[in-house]
A protein has these predicted regions:
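Small-residue-biased structural context
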Residues: 1-220
Length: 220
């Protein structure tokens, strides 16, 4: 099994066949990290401080953007690739159906946080808690039941091809932001595992361009 054993994830413990899910798991951990940052910022930020409001808004918009890219890649590329390979398994298809349905549950919660930020700050803690509960539950479900299907259905080469399709769809701008976002503030071991999964030219771009550009914007 080639998947790195990243802290806080379930898929590495459950096993994923030949597929290297390092990047997928790093994104999941980044969502968990930013949910914690979101709750902390909402509880402590001074709404009368424009700079603080702007930094919290920048972090929140980035979280939403990365979540949209992540779920779009799953719904439009990963799950459709898996479905015909797993058509013989009612259980597998029911898991994929559940993954898509859970994505639909998350979108209204993102909108609710937006509304609370803008016009109902007294509701902010509750809606952030609802988002965190739903999203972390979805991530755990996906790691437990969804991601192992990738190793069942796809070879390592086929999984890499799916990754290239996602990269083409996202483009260099979104892809560079995604890697800088995933590596932001994570521990040394996890950063090394995630960074090491990149081809050498992209590692150089990350150090020279992507990370410095990402760090220019205050967040949270």
């Amino acid at each position: 099994m080639t998947t790195q054993k990243l802290p806080g994830t379930d898929a590495a413990r459950h096993g994923t066949g030949a597929a290297d899910l390092t990047i997928m798991l790093a994104a999941h951990d980044a969502f968990r990290r930013d949910l914690t940052r979101l709750a902390r910022a909402a509880a402590t930020a001074d709404p009368s401080d424009p700079a603080r409001r702007q930094s919290v808004a920048a972090g929140w918009e980035l979280l939403k953007r990365q979540l949209h890219l992540h779920h779009t890649a799953e719904d439009q590329i990963i799950w459709p690739v898996l479905r015909p390979r797993l058509a013989h398994s009612e259980h597998a298809l029911s898991v994929l159906d559940a993954m898509e349905a859970e994505h639909d549950l998350i979108d209204p919660l993102l909108a609710a946080v937006d509304t609370a930020f803008n016009v109902a700050p007294d509701q902010l803690a509750d809606v952030i808690d609802a988002l965190a509960t739903t999203l972390t539950g979805h991530l755990a479900h996906e790691e437990r039941d969804g991601l192992p299907l990738i190793g069942v259905a796809l070879t390592a080469a086929e999984w890499r091809a799916a990754g290239r399709a996602i990269a083409r769809k996202n483009g260099l701008s979104d892809g560079s932001e995604m890697f800088a976002w995933m590596l932001d503030g994570i521990g040394r071991d996890q950063a090394a595992a995630t960074h090491g999964s990149l081809p050498p030219p992209l590692r150089l771009l990350y150090r020279a361009i992507w990370k410095p550009r990402f760090d220019k914007t205050p967040r949270w």
